[in-house]
A protein has these predicted regions:
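Repeat-blade elements of multi-bladed beta-propeller folds
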Residues: 20-40, 65-91, 117-141, 185-202
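Extracellular/periplasmic catalytic domains that process cell-envelope and extracellular macromolecules
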Residues: 2-3, 45, 202
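A short, polar/proline- and glycine-enriched secondary-structure boundary/capping micro-motif
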Residues: 45, 54, 64-65, 96, ...
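Short loop/turn segments that connect beta-strands within beta-propeller blades
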Residues: 45-48, 58, 96-99, 148-151
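Aromatic (tryptophan-biased) beta-strands that constitute blades/sheets of beta-rich domains
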Residues: 1-15, 50-65, 101-110, 153-161, ...
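Internal hydrophobic scaffold segments of catalytic domains
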Residues: 133-136, 140-163
Length: 202
C-alpha cells in the first residue's frame, strides 16, 4: 500500500464500443489480448498501448436478439501461437497470435433452430480447446465440446443435462440423470438448461 500514491495512468486503449466490457485480458510475451462486445478481438502492445491488430468475426447484428444479457464476451485463450475465442453466434475461431489472421473456424451449435450463443472464454488443455455455450434462458440443452487445437475438428461433446428419454442416452450419466427428472414435464422440449456459459475448471 505504500506505493499506491505513485500509481498513474500509463496508457489507455479505446475498444470502440460504448457497451460494457466483460473480458479478462491475457498478456503473453508483452502482448495483451482482450475482447470487446460483438466478440471483436484486440491485440495491444502491453507496454505502450499501441494496437497491433484487431479481428472482427462479423457476427450478424440481428443475432443479438438471441442473447439474454447483451453481446459481451469474456475473453480468449492463448496457446502455441494461436488465440482462441468464441463468437457470440456460436463459432469457435483460432487466430494467429502474431498477425490476427484466421487459422480455422468451426460451428459449435448443434441446432440452429435454438438460440444458442457463446459469451464465455474457451479453455485449452494439452491439444484440445474446450468451450461451452449460453442460451439456457431461452430453452436450449447445455453441453461442453472439445476441439483439436490445431485443426478445429470436434473431439468429443458432453451434455450437462439429459435429453429425450425416449431416445438413446449419450452415456450412463445421462441415463442416471434422466431418472431424476419428471418426464411429464417434457423438459427436453424446453431444452433442460445447464449451459456452461462462463469459466470452466478441470
Amino acid at each position: 500500500t505504500k506505493n499506491v500514491k505513485d500509481l498513474k495512468l500509463e496508457w489507455s486503449y479505446n475498444l470502440g464500443s460504448s457497451r460494457g466490457v466483460e473480458s479478462t485480458p491475457i498478456v503473453i510475451d508483452g502482448v495483451m489480448y482482450v475482447t470487446a462486445p460483438w466478440s471483436i478481438v484486440h491485440a495491444v502492445d502491453a507496454r505502450t498501448g499501441e494496437k497491433l491488430w484487431t479481428y472482427d468475426p462479423e457476427v450478424p447484428r440481428s443475432y443479438g436478439e438471441k442473447g439474454c444479457c447483451d453481446v459481451g464476451n469474456r475473453g480468449v485463450a492463448v496457446s502455441n501461437g494461436l488465440v482462441y475465442f468464441g463468437a457470440f453466434d456460436g463459432r469457435l475461431i483460432a487466430l494467429d497470435a502474431k498477425t490476427g489472421e484466421r487459422v480455422w473456424e468451426t460451428d459449435t451449435i448443434e441446432n440452429r433452430d435454438k438460440p444458442y450463443t457463446i459469451t464465455g472464454a474457451p479453455r485449452v488443455f494439452k491439444d484440445k480447446v474446450i468451450i461451452g455455450n449460453g442460451g439456457a434462458e431461452y430453452g436450449v440443452r447445455g453441453y461442453i465440446t472439445a476441439y483439436d487445437a490445431d485443426t478445429g475438428e470436434e473431439a468429443w461433446r458432453w451434455y450437462t443435462v439429459p435429453g429425450n428419454p425416449d431416445e438413446p442416452f449419450e452415456n450412463d450419466a445421462m441415463k442416471m440423470a434422466a431418472e431424476t427428472w419428471d418426464p411429464s414435464g417434457k423438459y427436453w422440449e424446453a431444452g433442460g438448461g445447464g449451459t456452461v456459459w462462463d469459466s470452466m475448471v478441470f
